[in-house]
């Protein structure tokens, strides 16, 4: 039995897109990209005029981030990326609750590349996780890489192993910007 329809999956993909880009982490990534570009341009001995033209000034990341959130085409493209992943709803049957954070959607790369990050939602082999409640987590996989998950698209699975819950909790802590949330206040995985 499916936990949601194809139409609901599309609607939730749009919601996930907003959740993914609304965070302070997105602003930090924008600033980091600009800083890396500036470093490369300086190493290439490019003029300050060109560097100023193609890199962000302090505070520009807020405006760019706001424009990203309002860019319907960008949201649609990102929603399509989420939609094309294989979605599984994990039901936590353990005594340990899922954490969430101020940056609730995390990624786990399963393909290694020495030159580029493979943790984007479009990356080959990516696993995306989104704790929805203390007992529910949406896990999304690149189905072309994780072929074994294809029959489980839009299905439930029971999570009976505390190790699985703790691993997602560790990743939620790692992924957070400033705040981690736990229903019962138990943040033992943080230690």
Residue ranges and their predicted role:
Residues 1-191:
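Alpha-helical structural context detector biased toward long hydrophobic helices
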């Amino acid at each position: 039995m499916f936990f949601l329809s194809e139409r609901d999956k599309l609607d939730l993909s749009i919601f996930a897109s907003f959740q993914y880009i609304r965070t302070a982490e997105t602003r930090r990534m924008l600033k980091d990209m600009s800083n890396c570009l500036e470093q490369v341009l300086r190493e290439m001995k490019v003029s300050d005029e060109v560097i100023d033209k193609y890199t962000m000034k302090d505070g520009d990341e807020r405006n760019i981030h706001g424009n990203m959130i309002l860019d319907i085409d960008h949201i649609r493209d990102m929603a399509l990326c989420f939609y094309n992943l294989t979605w599984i709803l994990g039901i936590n049957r353990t005594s340990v609750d899922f954490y969430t954070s101020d940056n609730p959607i995390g990624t786990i790369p399963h393909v290694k590349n020495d030159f580029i990050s493979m943790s984007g939602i479009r990356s080959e082999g990516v696993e995306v996780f989104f704790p929805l409640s203390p007992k529910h987590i949406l896990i999304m996989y690149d189905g072309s890489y994780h072929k074994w998950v294809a029959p489980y698209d839009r299905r439930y699975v029971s999570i009976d192993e505390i190790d699985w819950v703790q691993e997602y909790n560790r990743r939620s802590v790692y992924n957070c910007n400033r705040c981690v949330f736990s229903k019962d206040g138990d943040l033992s995985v943080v230690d």
